[in-house]
Amino acid sequence: MQITKTAVAGTLESSDVQIRIAPSTTMDIEINSSVAKQFGEDILNSVTAVLAQFEVSSAQIIIEDKGALDCVLRARLKAALLRATDEALAWEKIL
């Protein structure tokens, strides 16, 4: 998947996560989390798994986590990715 435009998903409310995605020539992931010491590695693993599923090889991704559950993180990232591309989607890979 090619990231072609800037997109945002989520909020900065407690137990949520805001994800901002923009086009880039490299993969740049920034994680700002209130629970980074406990779950920072798990957050990064979830993000890289979703990016692999969507076949994203380059993007600037900024994650502002306020203690979101893993399912919320993945859903917000998928929403942001879908908003950031103009490509036709292979839904069988996503679901």
UniProtKB/Swiss-Prot annotation:
InterPro entries listed in its UniProt record: CitD, Mal_deCO2ase/Cit_lyase_ACP
Name of a matching Pfam family: ACP
Signal peptide: none
GO CC terms: cytoplasm
UniProt keywords, alphabetically: Cytoplasm, Phosphoprotein
Function statement: Covalent carrier of the coenzyme of citrate lyase.
Assembly, per entry: Oligomer with a subunit composition of (alpha,beta,gamma)6.
Protein name as annotated: Citrate lyase acyl carrier protein
Source species: Haemophilus ducreyi (strain 35000HP / ATCC 700724)
